[in-house]
């Protein structure tokens, strides 16, 4: 299995896990905001789409041309938001699926510190974005618990889905 194939398999598996978590969220709690410094649940869920939006701009090395542009706003309708997250993933992964090994080795500009750009390979950026998705999914699982919903199994059992 190539590094590209491994990434695609892992990214698609993680996307399915993320969608499982998002689908478990109660639509009457989208404005839940656990702290003033945090996003509400709707906006945090939309981060999964925004990461793919940003990923496309990074893929095209647009960060050297200034801010990546105003990202699309989160849909108010939860099902539209879920569809948007799924579409963003599929569109972004389309770039990856078409990429050659040389495309993945190409250096692009990405944040390496506060207000600081550095060069990274596209493959390294892909893994960074995937890890960031997993991080935000962990945050979202806390929102799910705080909303009173059941937290589904992601990698193993949860209090709501014991395996034994």
Give the location of each predicted region.
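Short, solvent-exposed, charged loop/turn and helix-capping segments
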Residues: 25-28, 101
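C-terminal ligand-sensing/allosteric alpha-helical core of TetR-family HTH transcriptional regulators
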Residues: 14, 21, 47, 51, ...
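Active-site rim elements
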Residues: 3-8, 75-82, 126, 130
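Helix-adjacent hinge/juxtasegments
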Residues: 57-101
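Acidic catalytic patch
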Residues: 98-113
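Short, contiguous alpha-helical
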Residues: 8-12, 16-19, 27-71, 111-164
